């Protein structure tokens, strides 16, 4: 609503030369804006809904404003969509997916910003050379659709881009930051070697016995690789382990490589298949409907909220296995989803409204997630401002749902890399306050995982990552 108000209101638009949004609406939201006026009254009285269309009920009067918004977004002379990505494979795939959603809606004026590109190092620093090689390989293999988009590269800065002063410095390319004594500052801050690593985390998990291990955190922080490393290490120790993902990009297969270690079962919760199965059940339960009602219910069921509920049911079935085995999940429900499900009875009412009964696995899920002996939630972050802030918000969401995280994993840290590259040395120094904040204020337990020159792939590399 606020978005359309800014974009479609002539008085607001006339006050500014440029209006910059740091986040665009999703393709699903834009599709909802183009729904016919008829949906409004139907959703208000719909007893079959399983999605988040409800809050839009009664907004029929603003339909013209929504239509104008979609038209403005599709006008290349007035709107530019800027896709922002790190020079990493997973981030580039996500940028391509988001761009495709907008193109399907006729929003084609797109640009790509590659953020954090490291310049080719002049010296022989192995860490810097490896980082440049990884970035170049990601750009070589990036989705073809992004190659057609005008692209700008923003260099990896020695300092973090937080605060007005730092943002102004970004535009002053001739300005250089003093790097004197960077290494000394890093080592003097604290003894990095005293912070436990992934090997210690695996030992703690193993000692506590079977249960659920959930990786949660911002996209792109390395949840999939960490989940794979933990699962492979536990299987290598002789335990039965089920590693599951809801990641549509199948990053888990890339992390594990071709061979699956003995004792490890790998599965994928397919959101599309689960949503299809759930939607069919809802439609069957709804019974005979008029053509318009059925069409609107079907659109209702295309909502991301429907997918959340469907995936949540599959997630509950997987968690049930942890009574006897280790179950490692590389992508858990978001804190927002868990908050929506905070009161178990609310979710039960939703299921009863759409299905008539509550599966036993679902009924027992929230108590299991709240049991610290059964479920270990690991918040994964990078030692940077935004990932730490997002993990902190996620922790607050979980706590409001009476779920206490087991600890935090700080991933891909340059502190232990041994780099002598000036830019990377200062980046390492910049990690210190975030590592200290996590360890001293945010986390009950924390572990530090170094940045790796090559992405750990396959059983041996993952075992080495876990100290086995």
Where are these predicted regions, by residue range?
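Short, glycine/acidic-enriched loop or turn micro-motifs at the edges of active sites
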Residues: 25, 118, 248-250, 333, ...
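Phosphate/Mg2+-binding loops and adjacent switch elements
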Residues: 1-97, 288-386, 390-393
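Walker A/P-loop NTP-binding active-site region of P-loop NTPases
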Residues: 23, 32-37, 218-274, 341-345
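Short, well-ordered alpha-helices that flank and scaffold nucleotide-derived cofactor binding pockets
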Residues: 5, 100, 228, 232, ...
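C-terminal lobe/tail of nucleotide-utilizing enzymes
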Residues: 69-213, 370-374, 382-468
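P-loop NTPase motor core
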Residues: 1, 250-302
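Short acidic, glycine/serine/threonine-rich loops at helix termini
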Residues: 30-35, 96, 124-125, 165-166, ...
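Short beta-strand "acidic-cap" motif of Rossmann-like dinucleotide-binding folds
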Residues: 20, 112, 241-245, 328, ...
